[in-house]
Amino acid sequence: MTDIHNHKILILDFGSQYTQLIARRVREVDVFCEIFPHDVAADFIKNYQAKGIILSGGPESVYDSDVKAPEIVFELGVPVLGICYGMQTMVMQHGGEVKGADQSEFGKAIINILNSTNNIFSNMEHEQLVWMSHSDKVTQTGEHFEIIASSTNAPVAAVAHKNKPFFGVQFHPETTHTENGKQIIENFVVNICGCDTLWNIENIIENDIKEIKQKVGTDKVILGLSGGVDSSVVAAILHQAIGDQLTCIFVDTGLLRLNEDDQVMQVFAEHMDINVIRINAKNRFLDALRGICDPEQKRKIIGKLFVDIFDEEAAKIENAKWLAQGTIYSDVIESAGNNQSKAHVIKSHHNVGGLPKEMKLKLLEPLRELFKDEVRKLGLGLGLPYNMLYRHPFPGPGLGVRILGEIKKEYVETLQKADAIFTEELYKHNLYHDVSQAFGVFLPVKSVGVVGDQRRYEYVIALRAVVSIDFMTATWANLPYDFLSLVSNRIVNEVKQVSRVVYDVTGKPPGTIEWE
């Protein structure tokens, strides 16, 4: 079996908003990498045995901060790439000088490559469009570095060490705005560091299956299956690895999208022949939510009841030793970021509410090394349907936070029908994948309408569609008026409990993506 971790890159994080992008770009050229805090222990860096090290950008100013790259980085003899702040601290630690720029530079810029021989700019045109985001700049490179690229506002746009494989760029090759950023990353990782391209879906599947078999042996494994991307891919990889040793528990809350409960059973229980226990808990959730209007209270009730029901059912499965979860790499990084110590051991991220103490199950997280886009590709490689893997994000509490105020069975059914029409038309008009998220919201207010000669006094549905890269900010989707008119007409005509449809034109900020 191929050792997919044999050739790897270590990324030291100085707090840049783009650090995860660096990792994703490295993995896009089929090389494994991991992110750790910049102040991780020197022994850890030494023992990690990276083929190369990348120093990320960061929000600090080098000249008034004691945040520096560990000296061990420059003593190991492996190639180093400093990005933005990473370049500045590397140059400064080698006798160069960094000062505050007269003018901050944010946005696209043209750099001129002065030297592309055997470095990060190999086989690239002399003019390159890049993305700048900095307030400081290198003013003196010192005796060890030479300038290999410059721009109008950043005379030192990139540097190379005269004797060692150390490189720095003032811009951000990891962003899509840098036209040939992927080529720069590939030049560093593959050509300079000499990494073999082992990190691909076929190798990951082979590696994961072997690791799961070795770890689990003949034990039984329990998985909470929600129908979401992560738990679905975990179910598929575990089934390939251990077959009938896996039992999935699907808690049907009644708050899923239209027919989603049946679709989950169809894909996993019927087509893939996975052992799935379906728990019809619709009435329990409705009873628990009766009279509750506060959004936060609703979330807590739904989350606690879900875990309680899962625990009840899991306790009935004899000889189960493992609890599988869909923890992914961004969860792991987030957990590490919340840990203020320098420890490089990353704490577990329990995305199903944590391990119940009395169950004493060991945790199995087959996806913890993968980003979301890698999880989706893994799912395709395992034979899961494209539309299941590339659906829009869906909140954990489900429609519970898309029905404003109290949740009633009538409201759920009304929203399911309206939301399904919106989604169906987005697919029909090839708009679904042009937006990042789209859904309906049930408003518990009534509005007068006229259908035929009949006066109707029924509920209002709000349609929400946004475009976003990271979901931290979002713009409302500028869907065609004809399309919105069609969707509105269908909902009012086909869903008898709705008399009016409105479209949400609020960005984030000031609004949030979900209404509750």
Curated annotation (Swiss-Prot):
Keywords: ATP-binding, Glutamine amidotransferase, GMP biosynthesis, Ligase, Nucleotide-binding, Purine biosynthesis. The active site is at C84 (nucleophile), H172, E174. PROSITE patterns: GATASE_TYPE_1 (PS51273), GMPS_ATP_PPASE (PS51553). The keyword Heme does not apply. Residues 8-198 form the Glutamine amidotransferase type-1 domain. It comes from the Bacteria. GO terms for cellular component: cytosol. Pfam families: GATase (PF00117), GMP_synt_C (PF00958), NAD_synthase (PF02540). Signal peptide: none annotated. It catalyses: XMP + L-glutamine + ATP + H2O = GMP + L-glutamate + AMP + diphosphate + 2 H(+). Its EC number is 6.3.5.2. The keyword Kinase does not apply. ATP binds at S226, G227, G228, V229, D230, S231, S232. Residues 199-391 form the GMPS ATP-PPase domain. Pathway: Purine metabolism; GMP biosynthesis; GMP from XMP (L-Gln route): step 1/1. One of its GO terms (molecular function) is GMP synthase activity. InterPro entries: Class_I_gatase-like, GATASE, GMP_synth_C, GMP_synth_GATase, GMP_synthase, GMPS_ATP_PPase_dom, NAD/GMP_synthase, Rossmann-like_a/b/a_fold. PANTHER family: GMP SYNTHASE [GLUTAMINE-HYDROLYZING], GMP SYNTHASE-RELATED. Homodimer. Catalyzes the synthesis of GMP from XMP. This is GMP synthase [glutamine-hydrolyzing]. It comes from Francisella tularensis subsp. mediasiatica (strain FSC147).
